[in-house]
Design a protein with these regions (language model features):
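Short loop/turn microsegments at loop-to-beta-strand junctions
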Residues: 1-2, 67
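Conserved mixed alpha/beta core segments that line enzyme active sites in large multi-domain catalysts
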Residues: 11-13, 27-70, 204-206
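A short, polar/charged loop-to-alpha-helix boundary motif
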Residues: 20-33, 89-98
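A short, hydrophobic, proline-anchored segment that marks a local hinge/packing element in signaling
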Residues: 65-74, 83, 218-219
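Gly/Pro-rich active-site capping loops and adjacent beta-alpha segments
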Residues: 77-139, 236-239, 250
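N-terminal leader/propeptide and maturation segments of large enzyme subunits in energy/redox metabolism
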Residues: 112-190
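Accessory "access/gating" subregions that flank catalytic or transport cores
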Residues: 158-236
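Alpha-helical support elements that line or immediately flank enzyme active sites
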Residues: 233-265
C-alpha cells in the first residue's frame, strides 16, 4: 500500500516513497476526482471518500484501488486531499488474483472502480460497495475481504485528514499550503538543475514477447527542460501487458528522481 498527501489541485506533496509506480500516478487519480466531480451535479462534499482503480484515470492494474478523501478546512472547497492506494488480493476477473495474462478487455481483468463514492457523510456505503464488487460476469471472489481492506484505507485517509486539519489549525491553512508549494518548487529546481547536466540519447529495448520500447531523450539546457519521446515503440498489445499514460509518467519521473543526489521529497515538482 501507499499513502500520500496532495494540495487542493491534486498535486503530490508528500508520501512514503516505497512504491514508485503508485506515487507517480496517484496524482492523476485525485485530479480525475476533481475533474469529474466538478461537473456531476453533486460535487465534492465533507465526509466523502471515493474509490478509483481505472487505468486511464490514474490507476495501475485493477487490484490497486485508490481511496481518495478531500480535506476541508475553512470553506466548502477542499484545501487538500489525502489518498491511500492498496493492492487487493483479488478483484474478480477470469483468474484469481485479477492479473490474467490473457485478458482481452477490462471486464476480464476484474471489477472497475472509476470515481465511485464509497463514503457519504462519514458513513461507509457497505451495500453499494458490495453490490459493485459482486456485479458482472466475473465478480470479486471475496468481497468481504475487499470491503475490510477498503475500510482500512478509509481509516488511513481519516488519520491523514485529521493531522492536516490539526496542522492547519495550528499554523493557518494558507501557511501550510505555502510550505507545500515551496517543497514542490524545491523539487522542481533540483530536477531542472539535473536536466541541465544530461545529454540527448536514443535507446531501444526488446521485450521477450517480441515487442520493442523506443525512447528518445531530448534535452534543452537553456530552458532546463527534457522531452521523453516513445515514438517508434510497438503498438498496444492485445492483452493486459500495456502501460497507460499515468504509469509511463510515473516511471519517467522515478528515473529522474533516482539520478538526484539531493535528499528532496518525491512530489509533483
Amino acid at each position: 500500500f501507499s499513502c500520500a498527501i496532495f494540495d487542493g489541485a491534486g498535486r503530490l506533496v508528500a508520501n512514503a516513497p516505497h512504491m514508485p509506480v503508485h506515487l507517480g500516478s496517484m496524482g492523476e487519480s485525485v485530479r480525475t476526482i476533481l475533474r469529474q466531480r466538478a461537473r456531476d451535479g453533486r460535487g465534492i462534499k465533507r465526509g466523502d471518500a471515493y474509490a478509483l482503480n481505472a487505468p486511464y484515470d490514474g490507476g495501475t492494474h485493477l487490484p490497486d484501488i485508490t481511496v481518495i478523501m478531500p480535506v476541508f478546512v475553512e470553506d466548502d472547497t477542499p484545501s487538500f486531499f489525502v489518498a491511500a492506494r492498496g493492492h487487493h488480493a483479488d478483484l474478480g476477473g477470469i483468474a484469481p488474483g485479477s492479473m490474467p495474462p490473457y485478458s482481452r478487455n477490462i471486464e476480464e481483468e476484474g471489477i472497475l472502480f472509476d470515481n465511485m463514492l464509497i463514503v457519504d457523510d462519514g458513513n461507509f456505503l457497505d451495500a453499494a460497495v458490495n453490490a459493485h464488487l459482486t456485479a458482472g460476469d466475473w465478480p470479486a471472489r471475496n468481497p468481504a475481504l475487499n470491503i475490510a481492506d477498503l475500510k482500512a484505507q478509509v481509516a488511513a485517509c481519516q488519520r491523514g485528514a485529521s493531522a492536516l486539519a490539526d496542522l492547519s489549525a495550528a499554523h493557518g491553512v494558507r501557511t501550510v499550503a505555502a510550505y507545500m508549494a515551496h517543497g514542490q518548487r524545491q523539487a522542481e529546481t533540483a530536477v531542472r538543475q539535473l536536466i541541465a547536466r544530461l545529454d540527448n540519447g536514443k535507446f531501444r529495448y526488446a521485450m521477450d514477447n517480441g515487442a520493442e520500447v523506443a525512447v528518445a531523450v531530448a534535452i534543452d539546457r537553456t530552458a532546463r527542460h527534457v522531452t521523453i519521446d516513445f515514438t517508434g515503440s510497438s503498438a498496444t498489445l492485445p492483452d493486459n501487458f500495456n502501460a497507460p499514460l499515468p504509469v509511463v509518467r510515473a516511471a519517467v519521473l522515478y528515473v529522474l528522481r533516482t539520478m538526484l543526489d539531493d535528499p528532496i521529497p518525491m512530489n509533483e515538482g
